[in-house]
């Protein structure tokens, strides 16, 4: 069963109040969507960090607001500029029947197969914007490198998309280039050949 993050509403906005929340193990947040203009609140630091580690930025999660379970995107995560800890989170509450635009990671599977084929992968972009209903949005898009046996350029149009999903960017944009690996065995030089012949004649 997918975990549900509890969203607690708050009405005070002072700096001291926000710092108090953080010391008590919470992260200040704001939630917004079609039926929610802007709702300040806070979430459990421990529970959010666990979900964030799994889902990442733009990840889709279940969130409980006013006793109602909703689907939300982790829209923005602010971190302390020195300590690096999370200090604020934005959640976008989704309407199930309205398409959304989301930036998702591109994942390459079976990358190890390229080495055995004398090839190397040169990545050009790591994410791409897609459009679809919230229920159809994947956590990432996959490119299976098992299919590539020679040098080529992989474009956005080459990505196999889940049903109901489309890429909003230029489909001719290059995602990655598969090239010949430059790592080859060092050829034996004339000098080494002569050294080998000399050692044989002296033995």
Curated annotation (Swiss-Prot):
Assembly and partners are described as:
Part of the 50S ribosomal subunit; part of the 5S rRNA/L5/L18/L25 subcomplex. Contacts the 5S rRNA. Binds to the 5S rRNA independently of L5 and L18.
Please identify the protein, giving its name as recorded.
Answer: Large ribosomal subunit protein bL25
MF annotations from Gene Ontology: 5S rRNA binding; structural constituent of ribosome
Q: Tell me the HAMAP family matching this sequence.
A: Ribosomal_bL25_CTC
Report if keyword Mitochondrion is assigned.
no
Kindly name one Pfam family recorded for this protein. Ribosomal_TL5_C
Gene Ontology CC terms: cytosolic large ribosomal subunit
UniProt function note: This is one of the proteins that binds to the 5S RNA in the ribosome where it forms part of the central protuberance.
UniProt xrefs under InterPro entries: Rbsml_bL25/Gln-tRNA_synth_N, Ribosomal_bL25/Gln-tRNA_synth, Ribosomal_bL25_b-dom, Ribosomal_bL25_C, Ribosomal_bL25_long, Ribosomal_L25_dom, Ribosomal_uL5_bac-type
Which portions of the sequence form the region Disordered? 182-203
| Top-level taxonomic group | Bacteria
